[in-house]
Amino acid sequence: MCKYFIKIVSKSAKK
């Protein structure tokens, strides 16, 4: 669960 969240956040943070 957290893994997915982190993955999405990482993408957003890269923006």
From Swiss-Prot:
GO terms for cellular component: extracellular region. The modification Lysine amide is found at K15. It is found in: Secreted. One of its GO terms (molecular function) is toxin activity. Keywords: Amidation, G-protein coupled receptor impairing toxin, Secreted, Toxin. Expressed by the venom gland. Anti-inflammatory peptide. By activating the G-protein coupled receptor formyl peptide receptor 2 (FPR2), this peptide markedly activates neutrophils, resulting in cytosolic calcium increase, superoxide anion production, and chemotactic cellular migration. In vivo, when tested on a auto-antibody-injected model, its administration strongly blocks the clinical phenotype of rheumatoid arthritis (RA). Mechanistically, this peptide inhibits inflammatory cytokine synthesis from the joints and neutrophil recruitment into the joint area. This is Scolopendrasin-9. It comes from Scolopendra mutilans (Chinese red-headed centipede).
